């Protein structure tokens, strides 16, 4: 029985080789490894009637937009305009400061009125 060696993965051609018979049969563990590693040509038999490998899918438009800033703006600037249901910390501190200032003025006015009376 003649045996030929077939690479299990494109990255590890030097060390990992799977031996298969000329009939194209693999033992169950080799077939499982080929399926897990993504080498489908080891699992499927080559048939001249089947079409060749499909070209890679076109990358999505969304992925392209991430690489190229739209209108020359950076990503951080584009995030500033997004709506957030949560209050911005700076606005919350300003509100707290104004409320405390109003109460302090009211308390001072009440004390001044009481002292003068």
From Swiss-Prot:
Q: Where is this region: Disordered?
A: 1-30, 43-87
A Pfam family per the record: DUF4687
- Compositional bias, Polar residues, is annotated for 1-12
> Its domain of life?
Eukaryota
Q: Which InterPro entries match?
A: DUF4687
Q: Which PANTHER family match?
A: GENE 5617-RELATED, SIMILAR TO HYPOTHETICAL PROTEIN FLJ20010
Q: What is this protein called?
A: Uncharacterized protein C11orf71 homolog
Q: Name its species.
A: Mus musculus
Q: What gene is this protein translated from?
A: Gm5617
């Amino acid at each position: 029985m003649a045996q030929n060696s077939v690479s299990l993965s494109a990255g590890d051609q030097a060390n990992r080789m799977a031996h298969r018979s000329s009939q194209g049969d693999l033992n169950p563990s080799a077939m499982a490894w080929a399926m897990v590693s993504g080498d489908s040509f080891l699992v499927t038999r080559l048939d001249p009637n089947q079409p060749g490998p499909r070209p890679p899918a076109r990358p999505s438009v969304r992925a392209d937009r991430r690489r190229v800033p739209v209108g020359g703006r950076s990503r951080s600037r584009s995030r500033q305009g997004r709506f957030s249901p949560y209050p911005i910390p700076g606005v919350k501190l300003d509100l707290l400061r104004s409320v405390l200032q109003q109460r302090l003025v009211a308390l001072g006015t009440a004390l001044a009125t009481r002292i003068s009376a």
